[in-house]
Amino acid sequence: MKKIIFAFIILFVFLLPMIIFYQPWVNALPSTPRHASPEQLEKTVRYLTQTVHPRSADNIDNLNRSAEYIKEVFVSSGARVTSQDVPITGGPYKNIVADYGPADGPLIIIGAHYDSASSYENDQLTYTPGADDNASGVAGLLELARLLHQQVPKTGVQLVAYASEEPPFFRSDEMGSAVHAASLERPVKLMIALEMIGYYDSAPGSQNYPYPAMSWLYPDRGDFIAVVGRIQDINAVRQVKAALLSSQDLSVYSMNTPGFIPGIDFSDHLNYWQHDIPAIMITDTAFYRNKQYHLPGDTADRLNYQKMAQVVDGVITLLYNSK
């Protein structure tokens, strides 16, 4: 009997972290009849990566053209639209904020940064088109705007396009999301960062992880979308995962881990944690899958717009089901 009890204790010790970390049992929400347009997603990505390329910190004119494009889409969706200054030398840098639903009460915030990275390669400055990082997230944000125009949400929803996430601003007070998070006056139920949602690869071995042992729980093919949060964000992650699972052809995996795990805080959601706001990231896992991360090869033709649309469908399902 003691051996049986000991075996159960060992099993519990191993299973409990796995259940918290991996969340294998989540029921899908009913899907919404309204759907994102893969064609419109591609149109937005191509505009951001070709017409206003590069969108890096040293190309302020292209950043401002991107901001105007985003603002026009938000306005046409019937939102209450404002511009928020991000105080950075050499600006103006602007967050574009769109509000839907009730003008007071708690909010759900969906955010994506519209800037792209630059880097030195062989002592020469190079620019990425930033299709996956992060024109894909912005395209998702603008499709959400179009869908929210068709049906006003019952809860307050705020869509935010951030001006500055990439280096040299990352992890600084000059991140657009840091400025936005510090300015909030309404209570926030949930913040979601759309960070690289467009690249998928079904080849064996195409998916990597911060630690090799994670491959015991997660696929080796990069054909899924991930929902990522801290341990204390477990309810938020479950809620978002359930909504994404409403897209039946979309493979969804989730992860709740301590903040020190590499990759867990690699986007704008990290700035909301400082204000005790539940905040999670929806991502294709960035450089753990996409080998053109921050490189010139991050182009529009490499993205899967059907899967991107399924991700947006999941997020709009969440918003329509929130009260």
UniProtKB/Swiss-Prot annotation:
Superkingdom, natural source: Bacteria
UniProt xrefs under InterPro entries: M28_fam, Peptidase_M28
Keyword Transmembrane: yes
Transmembrane residue ranges: 4-24
CDD domains in UniProt: M28_like
Protein keywords: Membrane, Transmembrane, Transmembrane helix
Main location: membrane
GO terms of molecular function: metalloexopeptidase activity
Protein name: Uncharacterized protein YfbL
Species of origin: Escherichia coli (strain K12)
